[in-house]
């Protein structure tokens, strides 16, 4: 076999539908749109969710709940992510952003207790879970709420 003898696998290369190019092509005249009706027209068709005039499902179901505009949004981070720092480092939200551990601080940073911490760190954050605070102190570190 030579390079010029290579051929694509059978059925892997399909030519596109060229509609409206004469009746002999099989896709002439109505261009595979059927006869008359909304879908045969330019720009025809119904919007998503339209059920032919029947009250659509999204309007039959009741509205529920509301958005609390006073809700605080904390950036959550597990303590196993803090193992990248050296012993006795003061870990602040600014340092976490600088090191790429988190990308953005909204209303503060909350430290969660998933994983293990091997380093002795001074961690400054807005909130701590009970498990996270215990694990930081067990590793010889300090917890400071800012």
Swiss-Prot record:
One example of a Gene Ontology biological process annotation: translation
GO terms for MF: rRNA binding; structural constituent of ribosome
Biased segments, Gly residues type: 42-52
Gene Ontology CC, one term: cytosolic large ribosomal subunit
InterPro entries the UniProt entry points to: Ribosomal_uL15, Ribosomal_uL15/eL18, Ribosomal_uL15/eL18_sf, Ribosomal_uL15_bac-type, Ribosomal_uL15_CS
Pfam families: Ribosomal_L27A
Domain of life: Bacteria
Ranges of Basic and acidic residues composition bias in the record: 1-13
Keywords: Ribonucleoprotein, Ribosomal protein, RNA-binding, rRNA-binding
Chain intervals for the UniProt region annotation (Disordered): 1-55
Keyword Glycosyltransferase annotated: no
Role: Binds to the 23S rRNA.
Family under the similarity heading: Belongs to the universal ribosomal protein uL15 family.
Record HAMAP family: Ribosomal_uL15
The protein's assembly and partners: Part of the 50S ribosomal subunit.
NCBIfam families membership: rplO_bact
Protein name (database record): Large ribosomal subunit protein uL15
Originating organism: Clostridium tetani (strain Massachusetts / E88)
């Amino acid at each position: 076999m030579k390079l010029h003898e290579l051929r694509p696998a059978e059925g892997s290369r399909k030519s596109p539908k060229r509609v409206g190019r004469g009746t002999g092509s099989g896709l002439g005249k109505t261009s595979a749109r059927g006869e008359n009706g909304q879908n045969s027209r330019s720009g025809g068709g119904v919007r998503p969710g339209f059920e032919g005039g029947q009250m659509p499902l999204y309007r039959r179901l009741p509205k529920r709940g509301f958005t609390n505009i006073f809700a605080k949004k904390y950036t959550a981070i597990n303590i196993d992510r803090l193992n990248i720092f050296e012993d006795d480092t003061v870990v602040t939200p600014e340092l976490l952003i600088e090191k790429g551990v988190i990308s953005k601080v909204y209303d503060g940073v909350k430290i969660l207790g998933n994983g293990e911490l091997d380093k002795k760190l001074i961690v400054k954050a807005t909130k701590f879970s009970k498990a996270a605070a215990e694990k930081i102190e067990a590793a010889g570190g300090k917890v400071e709420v800012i």
